[in-house]
Amino acid sequence: HVYSSVPQIEVLRMADVFITHGGMNSISEALVYEVPMIVIPFMSDQPVNARQVETLGLGKRMDYKTLNSQSLKETVLSVFADEKIKANLANVQNWISNASGNKGGAEMIREYYREWRNAHDNDTNETT
């Protein structure tokens, strides 16, 4: 079936993978519902958002200029099976659900990134 529009939040509640252009609203909704993302940015803030999704281990980004059905299929299957992405999403969702007062979701994402970066830097240092 092809639809001109769908109730995105209702669909996200049932989705295993979310293919998105990478707008901040869509990413935020995917984080709330712990849905792994494939971000295919087109303009504006979308490329930066896509890079952050991938850097934080919340999904993968793809280039619409080189996208084809085979690469999309492979990426969907990869993201769907990636337990690390699912664990990262669960951590972010937990932080979001516990946000209160002065500590909003944006600060929690920054905190998650700092923790991820520290862990990643430690992993890199251990292998050298």
Which residue ranges define each predicted feature?
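Phosphate-coordinating loops and pocket residues in cytosolic domains that bind phosphorylated ligands
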Residues: 13, 55, 91
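Short acidic (Asp/Glu) and glycine-rich catalytic loops that position anionic groups and cofactors
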Residues: 32-33, 54-56, 84-88
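Short, hinge-like loop/turn segments at secondary-structure boundaries
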Residues: 38, 55-57, 80
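C-terminal amphipathic helix plus adjacent low-complexity
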Residues: 69-128
